[in-house]
């Protein structure tokens, strides 16, 4: 399951999907695994974070992804983990638009209502286009790269994001 709202609907199914399926994979597959995790494993922290920053997940989604990472790291599999930022953009004709993400919410409101409301706005979002994930991951399919890597293109406040949308 992806995202806080979807995971909160059915915690048991979330754990089965995000944690137990990874455990089953590592127990039955001896090959290399490239795993998409999330920057949400860090929780709410100040300052610039890197891959060695302490984790502190604040949601079931983030907890389940971190637990899956730990299973992968303790397995004998060769594992490459990408901690993805907040994804945006349509990837293909089968993708669904996530209307729970701030970028999409603000854009939809700007288009349909002609205005956006931002409360606070100081929260940061590590944005990442879905095609940038593919650009980063594809070269690693045929390598032996391992480890954990944060993957995002821009860390922007919600207010800055609203201003960018407004300027378009």
Language-model segments: which ranges?
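Conserved beta-loop-beta element that borders a ligand/cofactor-binding pocket
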Residues: 33, 37-38, 69-92
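C-terminal substrate-binding subdomain of Rossmann-fold SDR/epimerase-dehydratase oxidoreductases
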Residues: 113-168
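Hydrophobic positions on the long internal alpha-helix
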Residues: 21, 25-29, 71-72, 136, ...
């Amino acid at each position: 399951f992806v995202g806080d709202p979807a995971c909160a609907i059915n915690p048991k199914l979330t754990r089965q999907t995000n944690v137990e399926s990874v455990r089953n994979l590592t127990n039955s597959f001896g090959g290399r695994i490239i795993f998409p995790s999330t920057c949400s494993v860090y929780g709410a922290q100040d300052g610039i974070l890197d891959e060695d920053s302490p984790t502190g997940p604040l949601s079931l989604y983030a907890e389940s992804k971190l637990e899956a990472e730990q299973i992968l790291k303790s397995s004998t599999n060769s594992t490459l983990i990408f901690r993805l930022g907040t994804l945006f953009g349509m990837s293909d004709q089968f993708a669904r638009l996530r209307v729970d993400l701030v970028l999409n919410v603000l854009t939809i409101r700007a288009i349909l209502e002609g205005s956006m409301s931002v409360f606070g706005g100081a929260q940061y979002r590590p944005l990442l286009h879905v095609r940038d994930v593919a650009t980063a991951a594809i070269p690693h399919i045929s390598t032996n790269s391992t480890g954990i890597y944060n993957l995002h293109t821009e860390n922007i406040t919600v207010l800055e994001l609203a201003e960018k949308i407004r300027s378009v």
